[in-house]
A protein has these predicted regions:
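Residue-level signal for pocket-adjacent positions within structured domains
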Residues: 158, 169, 192-196
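N-terminal nucleic-acid engagement/recognition segments and initiation subdomains in replication
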Residues: 1-83, 95-99
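Short secondary-structure junctions
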Residues: 4-8, 145-148, 194-197
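Short glycine/serine/proline-enriched coil/turn segments at secondary-structure junctions
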Residues: 115-116, 177-179
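Walker B catalytic acidic pair
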Residues: 172-174, 185
Length: 197
């Protein structure tokens, strides 16, 4: 029931445990319920040992939700990448848009399976307000919790924490106000292979 989520770097409860929960992340309330249950059922009261045991169990049940999702996919033979940008955003269905999206998607998949692998490409979509660019990226992320558009500044102390747990990151606000200096900061940011949290 408890597993270590590699993507978010936290312990999750992945099976029902007898009380209502809002999210999968193991939180303080969950710990209180678990401590009460273990005390009443088994007479266990040493919180440090219980916490250590939960850590061991979680570590033995590691999972990565994006990898798990991608590994379940089976291609049905329908070509989608070539016409995806045209279908969703009205872009030209030419070789450039096809190759750009294909490269972006291959990079996203590679990063899911090999965090920190070299991938310095950012897909930039240009279009008016309400064209669907943010929605497109959110849909590419598959689940809302794997998408973020909250990256406003790269010099923010919390920038890496904001990346944690997300697969697709939109930088629309940052790009809208970009200048030569900020473009160089973005390039430098994209070229980092190891993020420190």
């Amino acid at each position: 029931a408890i597993a270590y989520n590699i993507l978010t770097d936290r312990k999750d409860i992945i099976k029902p445990i007898g009380f209502h929960r809002e999210s999968t992340a193991l939180n303080d309330t969950d710990m209180k319920y678990l401590l009460l249950y273990l005390e009443e059922t088994y007479g266990l009261t040493n919180e440090k040992k219980i916490d250590n045991a939960i850590g061991i169990v979680a570590n033995e049940n590691k999972y990565h939700p994006i990898r798990d999702y991608l590994n379940t996919l089976v291609w049905d033979g329908t070509e989608r990448i070539r016409f995806c940008l045209r279908h969703f955003l009205g872009a030209d269905a030419d070789d450039y848009t096809y190759e750009a999206l294909k490269l972006f998607l291959l990079g996203a998949i590679s990063r899911a399976f090999q965090p920190g692998c070299k991938f310095e490409i950012m897909l930039c979509l240009v279009g008016g307000q309400g064209a669907g660019k943010s929605t497109f990226f959110r849909l590419l992320a598959v689940r809302d919790e794997w998408f973020s558009d909250d990256l406003r500044k790269l010099d923010d102390d919390n920038v890496y924490r904001k990346l944690q747990g997300h697969w697709i990151i939109e930088m629309s606000e940052m790009m809208a106000t970009a200048n030569a200096k900020s473009i160089e900061e973005i390039k430098s940011f994209l070229s980092r292979q190891k993020e420190v949290y």
